[in-house]
UniProtKB/Swiss-Prot annotation:
Assigned keywords, A-Z: Carbohydrate metabolism, Cytoplasm, Fucose metabolism, Isomerase
Protein name, UniProt field: L-fucose mutarotase
Subcellular localization: Cytoplasm
Gene source species: Klebsiella pneumoniae subsp. pneumoniae (strain ATCC 700721 / MGH 78578)
Enzyme Commission identifier(s): 5.1.3.29
First-level EC class: isomerase
One GO BP annotation of this record: L-fucose metabolic process
Disulfide bond annotation, renumbered to this chain: none
Pfam families: RbsD_FucU
Length: 140
C-alpha cells in the first residue's frame, strides 16, 4: 500500500496513469459503454462512480493546458442530459484547481476518440451520458 494514494485507484490504473505521456487520453466510462470493442486497454472499476475515481486521480494527474483536456459526450438529438452528472464531475475535477471547460462532442466523435485513447476505465456508473475523457498534460 502506498501513502496518500486513494484505495479506489487499483494498481493497474496507477500503472496506466504513470505510463501515459502528455497528450495521451483516458476514458472513464459508464457501465454501458462498449469499451471492449473499442481497442484500447480496458481497466475494470466495477462498483465505483466516475466522480469518485476522478476525485481520486486528479491529485496525481496533470490536465493538458494546450488543448481542451475534458470532453464528454453530447446528448443525441431528442435526448436530454442530466445536469447533475456534469456537476458531480466538475466538483470532482476542481478539488486541486479550477475545473477547465468541459467540451461536448457527439457520440460517434466520442467513440472515435475512445478508439485512440491510451486506456478505457469501465466503472459502475449508471448515469446516462456518464462518460468522460481526460487529456494528460505536462507535469510542471
Amino acid at each position: 500500500m502506498l501513502k496518500t494514494i486513494s484505495p479506489l485507484i487499483s494498481p493497474e490504473l496507477l500503472k496506466v496513469l504513470a505510463e501515459m505521456g502528455h497528450g495521451d487520453e483516458i476514458i472513464f466510462s459508464d457501465a454501458h459503454f462498449p469499451a471492449h470493442s473499442m481497442g484500447p486497454q480496458v481497466i475494470r472499476a466495477d462498483g465505483l462512480r466516475v466522480s469518485d475515481l476522478l476525485q481520486a486521480i486528479i491529485p496525481l494527474f496533470e490536465l493538458d493546458s494546450y488543448a481542451p483536456p475534458v470532453v464528454m459526450m453530447a446528448a443525441v438529438e431528442g435526448d436530454a442530459l442530466d445536469p447533475t452528472v456534469e456537476q458531480r464531475y466538475r466538483q470532482a475535477l476542481s478539488t486541486q484547481a479550477p475545473c477547465p471547460d468541459i467540451v461536448r462532442i457527439d457520440r460517434f466523435a466520442f467513440y472515435d476518440r475512445a478508439q485512440k485513447a491510451f486506456a478505457i476505465v469501465i466503472t459502475g456508473e449508471c448515469a446516462k451520458y456518464g462518460n468522460i475523457l481526460l487529456k494528460k498534460g505536462v507535469t510542471p
